[in-house]
Amino acid sequence: MGEVGESEKYLLNRHKEHHFTAGETVRDIIIGFSDGLTVPFALAAGLSGANASSSIILTAGIAEVAAGAISMGLGGYLAAKSEADHYTRELRREQEEIDTIPDTEAAEVAEILAEYGVEPHEYWPVVNSLRKNPKAWLDFMMKFELGLEKPNPRRALQSALTIAISYVLSGLIPLLPYMFIPIAQKAVVSSVIVTIFALLIFGFAKGYFTGNKPVWSALQTALIGAIASAAAFGMAKGCASSVFE
């Protein structure tokens, strides 16, 4: 395939684009933090509503954080591994089609370019050039026909660790007050304040990195966490009242 000319290289070097390229990592952090802040928070609030002691809430909360981190991390690993396996299967299938029905695949390249408004006299040289470079042809078909990018071979493990660590770090935040305040009914108030503040910060950061309105994202995230904890507290309080009546 041809190389970029000197004038094009000069223009590219003059203009360096700054795009955010860590989308997958941010997605994993969001998954881990959102569940890590919400689930242990709701559990601790629910147990507080059931009049459990701070030590019991702390023990149950840490157990949940450990189990949740393992479960979420494993889920992230399997999801990333499944994506990699899917890419490999499609890569083999596309390679087989290029080898067995090259004319049909070349016509598909022409069709793809035509959808971008490229005229026949303009895209046929491109098609013929790709046919001379099977590796580039295969890469073109994977990206533009199937919309698949080659996954990072370490992606599955990175996803698992990122989600699990994010879950642990965020899951311990709602439990911090129970480590220092022995009376659960007082600890839950501090837990609510600390966690809502953490949810606001997390929601703001999430909105900033995902291109949404940070303030709205912060309020939305905090509201969801507050509703989850209030529901858990209310249900536990109701169950405790009915059991001990």
UniProtKB/Swiss-Prot annotation:
Question: What Gene Ontology cellular component terms go with this record?
Answer: vacuolar membrane
**For binding Fe cation 2, which residues are annotated in this chain's numbering?**
94, 105, 108, 141
Q: What is the effect of changing residue 236 to E?
A: Failure to complement the growth defect of yeast cells deficient in the CCC1 transporter when grown in the presence of FeSO(4)
Q: Which GO terms describe its molecular function?
A: manganese ion transmembrane transporter activity; metal ion binding
* UniProt membrane topology term: Multi-pass membrane protein
Tissue localization of expression: Expressed in petal tissues, but not in other parts of the plant, such as leaves, roots, sepals and stems.
Which GO terms are recorded in the biological process aspect for this UniProt protein?
intracellular manganese ion homeostasis; iron ion transport
CDD domains of this UniProt entry? CCC1 (cd02435)
The residues that the entry says bind Fe cation 1 are 94, 97, 105, 108, 145
Localization, per the record, is: Vacuole membrane
User: For this protein, what reaction is catalysed?
Assistant: Fe(2+)(in) = Fe(2+)(out)
Report the protein's function.
Answer: Vacuolar iron transporter involved in the transfer of iron ions from the cytosol to the vacuole for intracellular iron storage. Plays an essential role in the development of blue coloration in cornflower petals.
Q: What is this protein called?
A: Vacuolar iron transporter
Q: What organism, scientifically named, is this protein from? A: Centaurea cyanus
